[in-house]
Regions:
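Conserved catalytic motifs of the protein kinase core domain
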Residues: 3, 27, 191
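Short, small-residue-biased leader/transition segments that mark boundaries at the very start
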Residues: 1-8
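Active-site-proximal helix/loop segments of hydrolytic enzymes
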Residues: 11, 15-20, 51-246
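Short, flexible hinge/linker loops that cap or flank conserved catalytic cores
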Residues: 22-24
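Short glycine-rich His-centered loop
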Residues: 27-46
């Protein structure tokens, strides 16, 4: 990406102050969604998506539990529970979250070398678009700083479902308001929300970096620090959290 090392959030051609969400006082209620589970395995490759998302979500929840600034919530009663996106959105909304992160893994056809990180915030025109887009930028910046290649425009993209139920991927430079729905979880939850594609489970190098046991811990730490930055809190040190990424 040309100029990808620039802080995306500092780009403002109008000269206006960068957007910052209004967050109130802690503790903050943060909902973590393991994107697949139960009878829904997700994508299979070097690692299985549901195992990767469960491992990452569990570690992220642990980090949030150890930080008094946060109350972690979940969209499933257990990682082995089968639940549709609509059911998970409903369970999340019942708990009045202030932010939601849905963790997924990407995949590609046999022979593809596709790799990298991308994430999807609530689309333009939705109530929580600005907050979601801001959080998505934090996630992408954190992943890039830890060695992930960012896909698309700065790792932040939009998804729309067309009439034939086909998905249309749109870069985040396209800010026009559209009627088509995006991911159900993003549309139906009552808070800012981002769906993150952590890595390609079908790419050995990608899966080793962010889909292995240590890779999931690394990604969880990145997500935790992005959550802290979103709410303006100081993250606990890795030593206090009982985690070393070395």
């Amino acid at each position: 990406l040309v100029g990808s090392e620039m802080c995306i959030r500092d780009r403002n051609e109008s000269g206006e102050e960068p957007f910052r969400p209004v967050v109130g006082d802690p503790p903050y209620r943060v909902c973590i969604d393991a994107g697949h589970g139960g009878s829904d395995p997700g994508a299979r490759g070097v690692v299985e998506e549901k195992n990767m998302t469960a491992a990452t979500a569990a570690e992220l929840i642990r980090l949030l539990q150890q930080d008094a600034n946060f109350i972690p919530l979940q969209t499933r009663n257990s990682f082995d529970e089968t639940a549709t996106p609509a059911q998970r959105a409903a369970q999340a909304s019942e708990q009045s979250p202030q932010l939601l992160l849905s963790i997924h893994g990407n995949s590609a056809a046999n022979g593809s070398t596709a790799s990298g990180f991308e994430c999807y915030p609530s689309v333009p025109g939705r109530t929580w678009h600005q907050e979601s887009f801001y959080f998505a930028q934090l996630l992408a910046e954190g992943m890039q700083a830890s060695g992930a290649a960012l896909r698309g425009h700065g790792g932040v993209r939009y998804i729309y479902y067309l009439e034939n139920d086909q998905k249309q991927l749109v870069e985040s430079t396209h800010t026009e308001i559209r009627e088509e729905r995006s991911f159900t979880l993003l549309e139906d939850v009552n808070c800012p929300a981002v769906l993150a594609e952590q890595c390609f489970v079908t790419n050995e190098a990608d899966a080793a970096r962010f889909g292995s046991e240590e890779g999931c811990k690394k990604a969880a730490r990145i997500y935790y620090e992005a959550i802290c930055e979103y709410f303006g809190t100081q993250p606990q040190s890795e030593q206090l959290a009982g985690l070393s990424l070395n």
